[in-house]
Amino acid sequence: MTLIVSWSLNLLSNFVQAASEEPGKSSVGRKVTGFRLNDTAAGQRSFGELAGRSATVIVFLSTECPMSNNYLDPLAELAGKYEGQGVKLVLINPNRDEGQTQVAKHAQEFQIKFPMLIDLEQTVADLLGAKTTPEAFLIDADGVVRYRGRIDDQYISRLKRRESVTRHDLGVAIDELLAGKPITVAETEALGCPIARPVVPKHAKDSNAVTFNRDVMKILQDRCQNCHRPGQAAPFSLLNYRQAIKWALDIERVVTDRAMPPWKPIAGFGHFRDEQRLAESEIATITRWVASGMPEGDPNDLPPPREFSKDGWQLGQPDLVLTMTEEFEIYATGRDIIRQFVIPIGFDEDKWVTAVEFRAGNARVAHHAIFFTDSTGQARKLDAEDPLPGFSRIGFLPSGAIGGWAVGTQPQPLPDGTGMRLPKNSDLVVQMHYHPSGKPERDRSAIGVHFAKSPVQKQVAGLPVFGFRFQWPEGDDRIKTTGWFRVPVDVHAISVFPHMHMLGKEFKMTATLPDGTVIPLINIEDWDFNWQQAYFYKDPIPLPKGTIIDLESYADNSSRNPANPNNPPRLVTFGEQSTNEMCIGFIGCTADNNADFFDLLRLRRPRAQAGASIKREP
């Protein structure tokens, strides 16, 4: 099968039949013939030249959409599979502002070795009614559209993937067409990034109208630009008006759905520092701006550009920078990667840590990280046993933890006078979570460590609350796990870190004080393994001796859970791998009385019950 990557640089069209379709309107059953494209590698090409003798597949792609990039390898495999059966593949980039330079750079980065064109006038996109990248169209030998929609069911929503593909929709449609059978499913919804249609911004009708310069830009600066700027994790930038109007409809949708910015705790159940949750007024502002035609407004209303650290360290130059000892290679596509890397610290004395900051070596693939310490040498042994850099399983009991990082989060210094002990002669073990980007990548990330500059009065300890369920039965979509812990000494809680794996759905923790007062600690109703992090309270929460911390979680081990790592579902047991399951809530805290700290460490053994039928002690 000839793979013609038709990302149109300059499209000249001459359509003999078929008027343009409204974007999103079904074109299945319509006949498409007679257009010509400018192919920068081979000159002007007609549809007849591009079409396969048995069928033609047209797929719309984008350089900026990560979901689109993740399909480059699968599409190449599809091309190879049908090469000898008369099916050709045409890939078209319909986004106006992804010009020749950007497309050429993208082709080089992703090692695309085929002619590339761009549909600048969106003529082919309009012809087929395409609205999304990636979106596929299967056209038979007579020029009739027989299938349109997704390539497969890898994604269940924007950027949220299944653990494994369960239906290859485009491949099934091709097989049925070649076999002379009716197409079983002729149309599916394509999930991805919207094709950037031409926008003619309107002028503000009155002085009270919402404008980009006065109202919207500040929201983007405060809520979006941590990630949406060059060199960071987001696939596109939101630094100016031109970039914002390109993605405006998409921005409105994801903020209305609260998919972005990523913030999992529900409002009012715990009060946290640097909450990335948009206020209702901010969502309303964006919605009104889009509805009114996205006016730019008075240039004098534009706030000053947000300043970011030039050296990449948001807290300033660290006292110690710990860098992965080797580069790690991330494959182009496939499942996410969880990998541990050992970094020797090399101190012969204990150190007090007040803040840690993560700097991704490759922001395109680094998604989140957790920083453990190991004083036993066991992590080094596991590293030595694995031929690749790092190792793939935990396999050791960490001596402690000093923090973590997730996309979009800010480094969180500990409260004044507190610190985490970094044991002498220990190693840092960094657990990395990587997202494949669509092309082979390399990463060598670093962690900046800040030490206490004044005497530490309180040592921070992690208080684990375990939900001890050892089996998650297959087929059950609401598996309840409860756990509890009685606080042995007076403490102040400063943070909470929920942890479950792929089956997790909901996670809630509360603290019941000795006088019966119930304090909400955290509540997540749409758990996502890919977005776990530590949350720091705005103010430390006093938890007197005898306080009971309750944990309640729900998991889904059915086929209805798209994150289920097993297809079909099977019995899942407690364990360290993402294919196992866990349920733990870590409370970062300090003992009110320093003399009680070692009692806190000694008495923080888990007290938890598996299942709702076992009640905690009064």
Spell out what each predicted region is.
Residues F35-T56, K205-R214:
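A short beta-strand-turn-helix
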Residues P265-F272, L302-W352, E357-H492, P498-E617:
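Beta-strand-centric surfaces of beta-sandwich/beta-rich domains
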Residues G48-N69, I174:
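Short active-site neighborhood of thiol/selenol oxidoreductases, capturing the structured segment around
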Residues E187-F347, N425-Q431, P436-G438:
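Aromatic- and Gly/Pro-enriched helix-to-coil junctions and flexible linker segments
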Residues L12-G34, G48-A51, T184-A186, A190-H203:
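N-proximal helix/coil linker or "cap" segments that precede and/or mark the start of modular domains
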Residues D119-A196:
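Thiol/selenol-based redox catalytic cores and closely related redox-interacting motifs
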Residues N69-F110, L117-L127:
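Structural microenvironment flanking redox-active thiols in thiol-disulfide oxidoreductases
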Residues M1-N14:
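Bacterial N-terminal signal peptides
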